[in-house]
Swiss-Prot record:
Species this chain originates from: Pseudomonas entomophila (strain L48)
Main location: cytoplasm
Protein family according to the UniProt entry: Belongs to the EPSP synthase family. MurA subfamily.
NCBIfam families per the UniProt record, alphabetical: murA, PRK09369.1
Enzyme Commission identifier(s): 2.5.1.7
Gene assigned in the entry: murA
UniProt keyword list: Cell cycle, Cell division, Cell shape, Cell wall biogenesis/degradation, Cytoplasm, Peptidoglycan synthesis, Pyruvate, Transferase
Protein name as it appears in the record: UDP-N-acetylglucosamine 1-carboxyvinyltransferase
Keyword Transferase appears in the UniProt entry: yes
Reactions accelerated catalytically: phosphoenolpyruvate + UDP-N-acetyl-alpha-D-glucosamine = UDP-N-acetyl-3-O-(1-carboxyvinyl)-alpha-D-glucosamine + phosphate
Pathway participation: Cell wall biogenesis; peptidoglycan biosynthesis
Length: 421
């Protein structure tokens, strides 16, 4: 199992390109199943979860064609089996996203109950209830969700999400794209990745309106056609590299990104003392060698502060001037990285869903273990400013969400290398 060794100290300085967003790419790949012709999706990040989704299509009899720039062409007409097997689904929760498209396009689906990150309870009941509202018959047995559309196909429905669910919104929106009549999704997720998926469905000829608000209206169409689409940039990767610059007192310009989808994070970085300038597709952060100031923050659904940036800001607060409170309202069990950071000398007290972080002047390198995707990013950030070497184990978590993290950090001047386990 690979490990990362990071020697702390250097201020980051330079420019990097941001990858496509995994959390947009996965639902968009799932939505290709809705088309009745070949679809090409570009700007895919080179990540394990993307490879798993493409492998899942291969298992279903679809043969994706991948070019050298990692754009993939998928022709769902060649599908041979409507089963998403456990051995693939268990490694990636996003596999549940094929459920809605398969039931809508092919009339049935069998999808294993998902695995993935070990944070909190992420029930799939909203996906099931949404499809049932559209007339699907669903049974959960033997660890599989077995769904069948009614005769004549899914019917449009009004559905209220009693908790905001990004993947739930995406799954039901995809199913509704081919349902008969109008569907209205209320208390829908507003994330930019949901908007990107809606734009993709519309690029194939769908009729989705209101994505980015809490009410999405979908008028079902008879067929969705071939299309070519480019996935949006990854706002969490963008934010992570900006925080990396902030903790090291450095200067970083991130390119091929979108500052408008990161406003809550940019505000907090300004509060921490960063100078930030933006263009249409770039953001530059400069700390001018200063130590950041501690910030208070509370995670909440978009457009508020994203839960996927919480761990990175705990790393920032850990070496900042002052004390900051970080309140996590989205997932339980999302402070697992705190106990690893204690090994590096961080002063963090967890009380329920709040972490009180008192900044110290210096962290100390130590052997630590990644526990989930974003927590592992926070350990990398802490290691960049720690005295001495930090060895990070279980970095397959990092590889699930960050494309070429060590190469990109090396380009900015970090002392980081990957060693085989």
């Amino acid at each position: 199992m690979d490990k990362l060794i990071i020697t702390g100290g250097p201020r980051l300085d330079g420019e990097i390109r941001i990858s496509g967003a995994k959390n947009a790419a996965l639902p968009i790949l799932a939505a290709t199943l809705l088309a009745d012709g070949p679809v090409t999706v570009g700007n895919l990040p080179h990540l394990h979860d993307i490879t798993t989704m493409i492998e899942l299509f291969g298992r279903m009899g679809i043969e994706p064609v991948i070019d050298e720039k990692l754009a993939v062409e998928i022709d769902p007409r060649t599908i041979k089996t409507l089963v998403a097997p456990y051995e693939l689904v268990k490694t990636m929760r996003a596999s549940i996203l094929v459920l809605g498209p398969m039931v809508a396009r092919f009339g049935e689906a069998e999808v294993a109950l998902p695995g993935g990150c070990a944070i909190g309870s992420r029930p799939v009941d909203l996906h099931i209830r949404g499809l049932e509202a559209m007339g699907a018959k669903i049974e959960v047995e033997g660890g599989y969700i077995k769904a069948k559309a009614p005769e004549g196909g899914l019917r449009g429905a009004h559905f209220f999400f009693d908790t905001v669910s990004v993947t739930g919104t995406e799954n039901i929106m995809m199913a509704a794209a081919l349902a008969k009549g109008r569907s209205v999704l209320q208390n829908a997720a507003r994330e930019p990745e949901v908007v990107d998926l809606a734009n993709f469905i519309n690029a194939m000829g769908g009729k989705v309106q209101g994505a980015g608000t809490d009410t999405i209206t979908i008028d079902g169409v008879e067929r969705l056609a071939s299309a070519t689409y480019r996935v949006m940039p990854d706002r969490i990767e963008t934010g992570t590299y900006l925080v990396a610059a902030a903790v090291t007192g450095g200067r970083v310009k991130v390119k091929d990104t979108d500052p408008t989808i990161l406003e809550a994070v940019l505000e907090k970085l300004k509060e921490a003392g960063a100078d930030i300038t933006t263009g249409e597709d770039w953001i530059e952060l400069d700390m001018h060698g200063k130590r950041p100031k501690a910030v208070n923050l509370r995670t909440a659904p978009y457009p508020a502060f994203p839960t996927d940036m919480q761990a990175q800001f705990i790393s920032l607060n850990a070496i900042a001037e002052g004390t900051g409170a970080v309140i996590e309202t989205i997932f339980e069990n999302r402070f697992m990285h705190v106990y690893e950071m204690h090994r590096m000398g961080a002063q963090i007290q967890v009380e329920g869903n709040t972490a009180i972080v008192t900044g110290v002047k210096a962290l100390k390198g130590a052997p630590v273990m990644a526990t989930d995707l974003r927590a592992s990013a926070s350990l990398v950030l802490s290691a960049l400013v720690a005295e001495g070497d930090t060895l990070i184990d279980r970095i397959y978590h990092i590889d699930r969400g960050y494309e070429c993290i060590e190469e990109k950090l090396q380009m900015l001047g970090a002392k980081i290398r990957r060693v085989p386990g």
